[in-house]
Structure formats: structure tokens, C-alpha cells
């Protein structure tokens, strides 16, 4: 007779969860940040709000963003004027867009990841799909399963409305799935489209305007599994440890509410201050067991909520400017793509490390950290181990 403990042992993988492939995708419509205020105030019929436009111009100038990608083109916005007003009932219109576009963009990223992985898609055992852009039944996970032609018995997990920290959440969940299910290959997809949050400017709600200056569209996909098959699967990063915590005294720091007018976004407190205040504790918990206390000796992937968060974290930890290079590069080229951002940064880091001839995927360093920040205020921490190039 076989014991339960023997069954459990046989069910578990031996090695750590490993990122085996990364793919990214964006809509074709590229928006230049320098000219965006003119476009935004024109398309929303708000050109008479001269002072507000000047404020928005300053926000865009200080954002450290050069460009973003958006599904919403001038043509789409002209056809759907309710989306351009500040709080006009427009949820139906927005939903009709995102329930199609979110899985479609996710598919584009997933196809790239599967191609890099080099294995048949029939070997995918689990799917994690994450979006803060719209809600539907059956969900975006189901739609993606159909679009990709995955097996009907793939084990699916749908994460709706998590917000900007969720790039860390999907890695945490993928790690647990890969390590506890021998031979599992998890397809992870984060797909975000700002059609749910786009709206005209308001004199009284400047936090909404901050979102209009920062958010962009993008999807990222990973293949995660333990015990990579030698010569066939090529490891990129290993995931060693994960944690999630709610920062103390941070209730209401970042809120999002699904309303008739779409997803409304609220920044109620000093978010950069809360993040920088709590980052030390998160790092000690993560790296003390590894005897690492010099945070310049590790590689960094942080969700770029905005430049102020990165500036304050750098200052608090006395980080060298190059530590946030990959993070700032992604913010500059794509804006804040919510949950997809940290996965884009993983991709940017491994590509630049290889291009520069460095020894590992993590800028030549062995250990690294990935941080997700978002509503709650919730902090996700992932300890990464790089792979030799």
C-alpha cells in the first residue's frame, strides 16, 4: 500500500520554480508623451481649461515617460464620446472594448513566450491570467484558452481587479503551482488596456489626472516550471522566495472603483512615502536568510508606479542610479502598464545583460528582488536567482 506522504513526495518537483520564457506585446498605436497633453485636451473637448492643461503638461513632463502604447486611437475616441467625458456613463462601451482586446493582446504576448520556450503548447498544464481591465464570464482566461487552442483541461486561474502589485502575485502563484506539481508548466499572462480608466480631465480630481499621465497598455507572458529539461528548456531566472504584505496605516492609499463611468482611480495618500517607509522591512525579511544586507549587491526590478516612488526608494536605501536602470527604461518606453510592468522589466533586464556580455541574466549579479506595489497598499516581494548566460 502506498502512503499519502509517498504520493505527496512523488507529486512535488525537486528544483525551484524557474522562468523559462518571456513574451511581451503592445497595441500598435504609439503615443508620444511630449505631445500627449495637446491630444488629450483636444479629444476630450477640454481645451478651454487652460490652467488644468498646463498642470497636466507639467505632470507629463515630470513623469520620466517618453512614450506609451494605447488601444484607444483618435478614431475610436471620436466614435465613443462618452469615454472622453469625465464621469459619463460608459461602462458598456468600455467593457465591449476590453473583453475582446485584453485576451487578444494577451495572446500576442503568450505566442511569443511559447515560441521562445520551444515546447508544444499541449505541454502547458496551468494558466494564470491577470487583468484590471474589465470583468467578464467566462473570463479572459477562458477566452485565451480558446484563442491559443490550449487543451480544455488546462487548470485555469483568473485574477481580476488586483491592480499594480499583481505582477508579483502571478509569480508567487506560479511558483507554488510549479513546485507543488511535478512536471507542471504554467503559462502566466498579464494584460492591461487603459480603455477602462481613460476619461476627460477634472479640476476637482487631480488624482484621476495623474493616472491619465502615467498609464499605458501592454501584455506580458511567461512560462514557469521547475526542473527544466536539459538542452531543451533554457532557464532565465529562478524564483526562490515570495511574500505579500499590507503596509501599515495605508488604507485608502490607492483605490480603484468600477462604476458606470468605468474604473475610477484614486490616490489618497503619500504613496511614495508609504512604499519607501516599508521597503526596508520587506528587504530584511527577504534577504537576511541569505546574509545579504548590501542592496547595491543585488539586481532590482520594481513596479514603476511613477518616478517619485523610484526616487524615494533609491534615496531611502542609498541605491546607485544604475540599480533602477531596467525599471526606468521600461517606464520611459511604455509608461505604467499596471501588473504587466515588472514582467516587461524582467525581459528588459535579461536582454540587456546578454547584449552587454554580462555573466548572468541579472546584470551579472547572482541575487535580485522584484517588488510589486498597488492597492491596499499591498507590497509583493519576490527573491530571484539569476542564471549564467
UniProtKB/Swiss-Prot annotation:
The keyword Acyltransferase applies. It holds the Pfam family Chal_sti_synt_N. It catalyses: (E)-4-coumaroyl-CoA + 3 malonyl-CoA + 3 H(+) = 2',4,4',6'-tetrahydroxychalcone + 3 CO2 + 4 CoA. Pathway: Secondary metabolite biosynthesis; flavonoid biosynthesis. InterPro entries: Chalcone/stilbene_synt_C, Chalcone/stilbene_synt_N, Chalcone/stilbene_synthase_AS, Polyketide_synthase_type-III, Thiolase-like. One of its GO terms (molecular function) is naringenin-chalcone synthase activity. Disulfide bonds: none annotated. One of its GO terms (biological process) is polyketide biosynthetic process. CDD domains: CHS_like. The active site is at 164. Keywords: Acyltransferase, Flavonoid biosynthesis, Transferase. Its EC number is 2.3.1.74. The primary product of this enzyme is 4,2',4',6'-tetrahydroxychalcone (also termed naringenin-chalcone or chalcone) which can under specific conditions spontaneously isomerize into naringenin. Belongs to the thiolase-like superfamily. Chalcone/stilbene synthases family. This is Chalcone synthase 1. It comes from Cicer arietinum. The lineage of its organism: Eukaryota, Viridiplantae, Streptophyta, Embryophyta, Tracheophyta. The gene is CHS1.
